[in-house]
Amino acid sequence: MASIQNLYETVVGVLGDQASKVISALGEITVECLPEHYISVMTALRDHEELHFELLVDLCGVDYSTYKNEVWQGKRFAVVSQLLSVKNNQRIRVRVWVSDDDFPVVESVVPVYNSADWYEREAFDLYGIMFNNHPDLRRILTDYGFVGHPFRKDFPISGYVEMRYDEEQKRVIYQPVTIEPREITPRIVREENYGGQ
């Protein structure tokens, strides 16, 4: 635990006002920052001689709109990165809150960490978070014609469109979802002596 406390103090000293919040909980350090400080925070964590977080091992988008099963009062979207220092055998989490809920945009960290390339594409594809100055920001998991972003909390379970093969046109076509809602009533079977009576 002493190393976590030392890491916490070093991070607070190095980042200063660039970090909105530095949290030490459950044996992990989380740095929260605003979008305008994102690149400088990531660069400082990588380049500072005492920190040396040279690897970005994960980056993902998060939709907090129904966090803890209630209406979320803060910003809706965040980009969360996990960094690793091989030299110091330490990990740190960086969370940047995206300022606009309707059109989420944050700066790309690909110039700082090359490994962020496909992670940022995945966050764009699944959450609709745009990354400024990304070298190749396009969908990576869904179809190019896919409508919406499926990991957003307001995305319908059935989606917006479905695709099927049309025999007449001899090709795959897209059409609006044709799911018919139905009511399912459970069948109740009563047995004699059920419940020991």
Swiss-Prot record:
SUPFAM superfamilies: Nqo5-like (SSF143243). It is a peripheral membrane protein. One of its GO terms (cellular component) is plasma membrane. Its EC number is 7.1.1.-. GO terms for molecular function: NADH dehydrogenase (ubiquinone) activity; NADH:ubiquinone reductase (non-electrogenic) activity; quinone binding. It holds the Pfam family Complex1_30kDa. It catalyses: a quinone + NADH + 5 H(+)(in) = a quinol + NAD(+) + 4 H(+)(out). Its main location: membrane. It is an enzyme of class 7 (translocase). Keywords: Cell inner membrane, Cell membrane, Membrane, NAD, Quinone, Translocase, Transport, Ubiquinone. NDH-1 is composed of 14 different subunits. Subunits NuoB, C, D, E, F, and G constitute the peripheral sector of the complex. PANTHER family: NADH DEHYDROGENASE [UBIQUINONE] IRON-SULFUR PROTEIN 3, MITOCHONDRIAL, NADH DEHYDROGENASE UBIQUINONE IRON-SULFUR PROTEIN 3. This is NADH-quinone oxidoreductase subunit C. It comes from Neisseria meningitidis serogroup C (strain 053442). The lineage of its organism: Bacteria, Pseudomonadati, Pseudomonadota, Betaproteobacteria, Neisseriales.
